[in-house]
Each structure stands twice: as C-alpha cells, then as structure tokens.
Amino acid sequence: MDSNTMSSFQVDCFLWHVRKRIADQELGDAPFLDRLRRDQKSLRGRGNTLGLDIETATRAGKQIVERILEEESDEAPKMTIASVPASRYLTDMTLEEMSREWFMLMPKQKVAGSLCIRMDQAIMDKNIILKANFSVIFDRLETLILLRAFTEEGAIVGEISPLPSLPGHTDEDVKNAIGVLIGGLEWNDNTVRVSETLQRFAWRSSNEDGRPSLPPKQKRKMARTIESEV
C-alpha cells in the first residue's frame, strides 16, 4: 500500500474524530452534521478497501497532525486558510428528507463512475421534483451530498448518491447522472422538474418552468441504460 494513501486515511480518521467531538458538544450546524454523517460512511468504506482499522488509524492520524502543528508557525495556518476560496453549502432538503428510509417496488440501479443512481420504476404518471444538497465553489457544483426525487405527496422515488468507496466526482458527472435519472423516470410518463438550486448549478439545460428538455431519443437511451443494470 502506498504510504501517502495510508497517511491520508489516518489523518482523515483523526479529523473526523475531532469533528465528532464538536458535534457531541452541540457546536455543529446542519451542514456540519450532514457532512459528518456522510464522511463516516466514506471512511468505513475506505477502511474496508484498505484493510485498515479505523481506531488504530485515528491514533496514528493524531500523531501526524500533532507533529505538523509543532512544526508550524502561528502565521502559516492563517495565510493558508486565507488563500483558499470558501465553498458554500446549499440545501434543497431538510435533514429529515435526507435521512428518511425509502423502499422500491421495482428497484433499478446503475453505477456511473463514483455515483450510484437508484429509482423505483413502479412509479407512473406522477409529478416529480428533484432536490439536492451539495456544495458549490466559483459558482459551480463542487460536491454532491445527496439528490432525491420526490412526488407531490412527498414520497421518495429516486436517488443519486456518492459511493463511499469511490470518492470524487465532477459537476459533469453529476449532470450526466441527473440525465440518467430523469430519463428513467420520464420513461414511465412521469413529469420531472428540477429545483431552482439544481437548475442554477448542476442542470442548466431546462425550460423556464424547471422541466428538463430531453429529446425523446435521449430519454429512451437513458431509460435503456438504467434498465440494463439492476
């Protein structure tokens, strides 16, 4: 195993531990707690892939961080932090909507890069809206936390989520995944709208009412794509 891969995992484990302590003291806001929960799943997946124990890695990560802090001057961290552009966290969904369990009568699933696309193909003739929580930087989507498809009644019928074991995706990856999800839902005569936040940062090819403009040929292609993988 590459030493940089191991040390990166160890530091990530320790920093997650620090953030968990902050959350335990009720000092974290909703985006902070949301990222904490997502990163926990990611670390578990990475730990399984690398064959490393998280508790042991956390202790090793603490030693690495302490050594770096001893070497740093007081001014260096301030300069580094000031030079890094800040990302913004945008939320369409509440914590309840993000954490709610949902079930599919006719489950369909596709893995596209580091994103997992899931939908219930038993849903027909419904009005559906796509909502997402994600971060943006330089007015572009930086990291998708979770995207879900809701009916007017509030039922969850589709989802796009990052795979914990495969971190990293681009805004183009997210846009392509949204296209696949929309194509699959519209194949069953559902009407799909995209939230204003998603329209602005992740899905720009839409009509004025927020409905995505996909030609019939592309809809059929996307539907066949997701039907071919369960």
Swiss-Prot record:
What is the protein name stated in its UniProt record? Non-structural protein 1
Region called RNA-binding and homodimerization, residue ranges: 1-73
The residues the entry assigns to the signal sequence are none
Where is the segment annotated Disordered?
206-230
**Record's domain comment?**
The dsRNA-binding region is required for suppression of RNA silencing.
Location comes to: Host nucleus; Host cytoplasm
The protein's UniProt keywords, in alphabetical order, are: Eukaryotic host gene expression shutoff by virus, Host cytoplasm, Host gene expression shutoff by virus, Host mRNA suppression by virus, Host nucleus, Host-virus interaction, Inhibition of host innate immune response by virus, Inhibition of host interferon signaling pathway by virus, Inhibition of host PKR by virus, Inhibition of host pre-mRNA processing by virus, Inhibition of host RIG-I by virus, Inhibition of host RLR pathway by virus, Interferon antiviral system evasion, RNA-binding, Ubl conjugation, Viral immunoevasion
Assembly and partners are described as:
Homodimer. Interacts with host TRIM25 (via coiled coil); this interaction specifically inhibits TRIM25 multimerization and TRIM25-mediated RIGI CARD ubiquitination. Interacts with human EIF2AK2/PKR, CPSF4, IVNS1ABP and PABPN1.
UniProt region (CPSF4-binding), positions on chain: 180-215
Q: Which organism is it from?
A: Influenza A virus (strain A/Herring gull/DE/677/1988 H2N8)
Motif Nuclear export signal covers 137-146
Provide the transmembrane region boundaries.
none
Among the record's GO biological process terms, what is one?
Answer: symbiont-mediated suppression of host mRNA processing
